[in-house]
Amino acid sequence: MAREYKLEDYRNIGIMAHIDAGKTTTTERVLFHTGKIHKIGETHEGESQMDWMVQEQERGITITSAATTAYWGGKRLNIIDTPGHVDFTVEVERSLRVLDGAVAVLDAQSGVEPQTETVWRQATNYNVPRIVYVNKMDKAGANFKASTESLRKLLGANAHPIQLNIGEEAQFTGIIDLVEMKAYEFDGKPEENMKEIPIPAHLLDEATLMRSSLIESVADFDEEIMEALLEEKEVSIEKIKAAIRKATLSATYFPVVCGTSFKNKGVKLMLNAIVDYLPSPLDIPPMKAYKGEGEISIPASDDEFFSSLAFKVMNDPYVGNLTFFRVYSGILNKGTYLYNSTKGEKERIGRILLMHANSRTDIDEVRTGDIGAAVGLKFTTTGDTLIDEKHKDIVLENMNFPEPVISQALEPASKDASEKLSLALQRLAAEDPTFKYYTDEETGQTIIAGMGELHLDIIVDRLKREFKVAANVGAPQVSYRETITKSAEVEGIHKKQSGGKGQYGHVWIKYEPNPDKGFEFVDKIVGGKIPKEYIKSIEKGLKEKMEIGILAGYPLIDVKATLFDGSYHEVDSSELAYKIAASKSLTKGREMLGTVLLEPIMDVAVVIPEDFFGDVMGDISRRRGQVRDNETRNDGAHVIKAYIPLSEMFGYATELRSMTTGRGTYQMWFDHYEKLPRNLADEIIKKRGGKVKIDED
């Protein structure tokens, strides 16, 4: 089957923003104008096409990245609508990983908000070219210039308006296109009928000045424009557009447009900007991959072997397990086999679907640049490489996800629900790499862990609604970590020899702090002091012990372990004996290694009216918070940014509401781990005394 759209006519884009900036409403308008839907659903009425989960419709927020394909200006748009709530930044992270470009949506009244910074930082990490859409221009306090300035000031973004608004707030009636120097007026109807009008006389000088500034801003990216400016020659519209595109593709230059999606003004011009300035799969660097120890790149072409990355797994009530994947090269036909080179497993692709939020169309093939969904894959999870079987030694660059920072005990409401609960949690964990669950060995309780209170609320809600599992939930708990602060050489012996086949394992291991590098195991055994076949068991013993900790039952992190000596017994040595010996060595080293507890520190942004500034600052200080920044927003509100331990943040929403008479809001996300003060650490260790198991012979 021939390709319907050329690869250069693809736009794989994400729509990202702070919560409530109007991102889903904007996506709805895009779908309406591109003919994907024939009735507009409003987010605040719980009717949005892209917010398809019941929880999303009730809460008016986007939780999962819904994917859809639309068409505009002769181009094919694969659009992913991402959540703006910080508890769901993993959704943003994994969609940015597979997108080529993005639209950042700002609220014209607030400009850059705390979560804007988070998603902007994520997009910068992945080098994603962006355009900015300043939405809600009809809102009281809307200010296009101040919003653009907030991009420069708060994000350090090289942002340049390519439009000028005609009027603001209730008087926002139209837009001047600075590239073409044309003005448009909107009728505000869903069809967004635009009428070209003369540029209003009172805005002509400003528009001319802004256009000159725009042309100068792209001259650094285009020599011809630079020469034309030096020679004071006129620059053609085509050249300006080409230069803006080139600048945008560098991911260091950000065109800014404006509108009000809810009032149907400016969305079509934003669509034009997506088509004109955001990249096709051919405009971005080839996909990086690993072959053995070396690195290779895979060009975006149908003629290459098939390669793709699974970026989302979800359970669909009608078709079962769905795996979303982005195709980087080659062609895949349904009914064929692929190799999951991350897991080392073969997968059969029985059905391929093209998704629109939660509705689906069966298709026969996917090609380079496509985003598809496969049904019923058995082994594939988020971040896995799916590749042509002849190239099974190639793995695409993976995604890294943060570990959970908050946990809750969960008990099935009845005995019957127990088995269903286990299956449901298994499915939810397969969908979401930042959600984990395990059984507490001491109490036998099931523990669920995630990125925040809302994250776990949604999980519990989904258990009840989707899986029909009722469960009782305990109070949220902090997920502490343990680490070592000193180096030491520690012996570990496991010996049971009392007639018959005994057990014998003997190791010497040097432990060293390994900040931010996780667990590292080094084998320095020489002369066969410990046979090779037991080395893996020693590493496994250490890993298993690190999972349950050596101080207070929390995972031990950032340790380098070098196995340098030991001995063995020809008859009694076994894999199990060495595993236990390694575990004992680590427990024995608890004191000499200076083991400490670490607590998760959250990056918190509190938005309040000025009147409450003193009270809120005092409260942050009482919570062991360190204020790192304080600024005044476009609308006069204060934004206080601080690092605060997670343990001090439970119930903060209620207290902030009461402190600010309901006018304060906050957002927080995990930032780093820090050593817990000694007095608090002692309390926790004492409380969890029963959790620390000392290995005994």
UniProtKB/Swiss-Prot annotation:
Gene3D superfamilies: 3.30.230.10, 3.30.70.240, Elongation Factor G (Translational Gtpase), domain 3 (3.30.70.870), P-loop containing nucleotide triphosphate hydrolases (3.40.50.300), Translation factors (2.40.30.10). Residues 8-282 form the tr-type G domain. One of its GO terms (molecular function) is GTPase activity. It is found in: Cytoplasm. The gene is fusA. The lineage of its organism: Bacteria, Bacillati, Mycoplasmatota, Mycoplasmoidales, Metamycoplasmataceae. The keyword Protease does not apply. This is Elongation factor G. One of its GO terms (cellular component) is cytoplasm.
